[in-house]
Amino acid sequence: MHAYARNISTTAADTTVLEDVRANFGDFSDKTLSSYKSALERLFVIEDVPAWCPAIRSRTAIRSTRKKEFTDPSIAVAALGASPQRLLADLQTFGFIFETLCIRDLRAYTSAIGGKLSYYRDRYGLESDCVLHLPDGRFALIEFKLGNRQIEEGAAHLVQIRELIHEANASKPGVRIEEPSLMMVVTGGSLAYTRKDGVHVVPIGCLKQ
């Protein structure tokens, strides 16, 4: 649990988790790790997020590893033994915990309408922390940014992905990719607004079913 929590909201390979476990607890086989993961999934303790692989880059450029997530961020915090003071002193870890919180809320709020979550990341550093898919084919590109200073970066990523979709549709007219119905940066702030580029900035407290 501790090793998994150390890699929360990342695409770290299972071998990375295994090395972490072995460093702290000695001999531990990959078969044992796999059985532990299966048990935690059945108990709804962990629920990894699959990758979204649209035809906007070559398949080798788009990451396909599942992103590691707990069903609730409090489990990760408990596994890490992290206090509020420790999280405030380690904003990178706090950011990953915040991402898990957002994923949990979006899963809860959209499950009734058949919403499914994935993520996008390529080898060039372009990413969308979450892609929300609806049964009718519509989807939203979403970034999670704990601090207001990161909003610009998150919005830029979403706009770039939208532009890649435009370019892919223009170059392959016979294979059209739907464009995002919504681009949103979820923040830990208190102000909600829409930017000139069409990206909505939404505090996590404003999310609802």
Can you name each region flagged by the protein language model?
Residues 140-149, 157:
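Active-site ExK catalytic segment of metal-dependent nucleases
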Residues 18, 155-169:
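Short, well-ordered amphipathic alpha-helices
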Residues 163-182:
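Short mixed-charge
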Residues 1-138:
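Accessory nucleic acid-recognition modules appended to NTPase machines
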Residues 78, 151-153, 192-196:
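Switch/connector loops and helix/strand junctions flanking conserved nucleotide-binding motifs
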Residues 181-209:
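Domain-level recognition of nuclease-like catalytic cores that cleave nucleotide substrates
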Residues 138-140, 182:
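Structural motif
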Residues 123, 153-154:
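Basic, glycine-rich polyanion-binding accessory segments appended to enzymes
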